[in-house]
Amino acid sequence: MTIVHVITIDGPTASGKGTVAHKVADAVGYHLLDSGALYRLVALASDRIGVDIEDVDGLAKTASRLDVKFGPDRVWLSGEEVSLAIRAEAIGNRASAIAVHQPVRDALTKLQRDFRKLPGLVADGRDMGTVIFPDAQLKVFLTASVEARARRRYKQLIDKGISANIEDLLRDLEARDARDRNRAAAPLRPAEDAKLLDTSDMTVDQAVAQVLEWFAAVRKA
């Protein structure tokens, strides 16, 4: 049986996991799964049709019917490019609230696992190594101080032309961290066999180099 290698990169909001995952995928020539984008797509789609964030059945149905397409740095929902729309802070907060519901997570599980194709996959999210790909060849858990993450998120938003307030971002991150850690469905935590990487004082390239070093060691084993 052909083994399709998977690298999982999990961590809290704005820990740098998305950027690191993208660069690692480019370096090794693997497919990329941005699982957070899927939850943001559910948030956007459900918001547009008026589904309340506590309507679990409605949210799960929305998740199961997602018509999505991913391209380099772009994403489409039902044929409409929504790359910028899903990155709005309001959609991010809604996605975090929606992600606590197990039926929504269940609806997205198969969709996420379908990304596992040759030559391999780099998957970033919050439960990639613990729930979606527990047999991944390399599991990485990225973290950083909440202050460092707030600064990064602020820069990301400003660079994209989205207005932001760093104090508001700090409060939002703290609230999301608490919600992610304490939810009953797939709480945010490192897999037991994950490599821990604190990126508070690291550049993106340094973090990428460390992940690639770990993966090279895994492939030699």
Swiss-Prot record:
Pfam families: Cytidylate_kin. It catalyses: CMP + ATP = CDP + ADP; dCMP + ATP = dCDP + ADP. Its EC number is 2.7.4.25. This is Cytidylate kinase. It is found in: Cytoplasm. It comes from the Bacteria. InterPro entries: Cytidylate_kin (IPR003136), Cytidylate_kinase_dom (IPR011994), P-loop_NTPase (IPR027417).
